[in-house]
Amino acid sequence: VDGRDAVLSGTATTQAMIVDAVARVAATPGIRTVRSDVALAELLKPFPFAASIKSGQVALTGAYPSETAHVALLSAIPGAVDRMQLRSGAPDGFEGAARFGLAALADLDEGGVAFSDLTLTIEGRAKSAAAYDDLQTLSQRAPVGVTVAALKISPPVASPYVWSAKFDGTSVSITGNAPNSALADKLRAAAPDNVPVSTTLTLASGAPAGFEANTLALLENLLKLERGEVAISDGTIALEGAPAGDQVASAVTAAVTA
């Protein structure tokens, strides 16, 4: 302000915001003239917004349409690294969509969410089994106008990574972790038709090298026994059971320790 003359400077995302600001200042008692040096923010189409998490640290990138939205997004993730910039071109519903994306990010311990206008992509690793299940139904809860275009989620890490199979002579029960849902089908298919196989497997990341091949080979050898149990804990394998004779015992032992 120079005497009774005011000059507005800064950046706005719409011409309407500039007109409104000029009108507000002009209505101030004692102000005679108002000059606007406010610049329009760069227009971005599509309008980008992204958030990522790594080693517990969240980073926000892309654009925000107003300082109000900027503050709201930072408040939603306290301590986030802010690399966002003020830009124009945000679609209607941007803030609600961004909050929805940040809520999804809270279910990840590694990965990110990204918007192109109101189209959302999510990729990463779930922080828990419950979070993994929650993310699978994300599109059903999306705000009006938001499209979940891609959802690539890995299950949470299991440590130790465990798996076990028990054969009682007539049926097999399998429990523990699995890197994918297809493994249960492969295990059931590996048993003879007259040996029912029940599986209670939890999806998890962190499987040791060769895990899937090992489970199939171990099940094959377990079924050579009259009864027994085999277990994997990370890279350690344990097998005990009752073989029909010394020849079977030697063959199974050699196969498991190879």
Where are these regions (language model features)?
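N-terminal targeting leaders
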Residues: 1-258
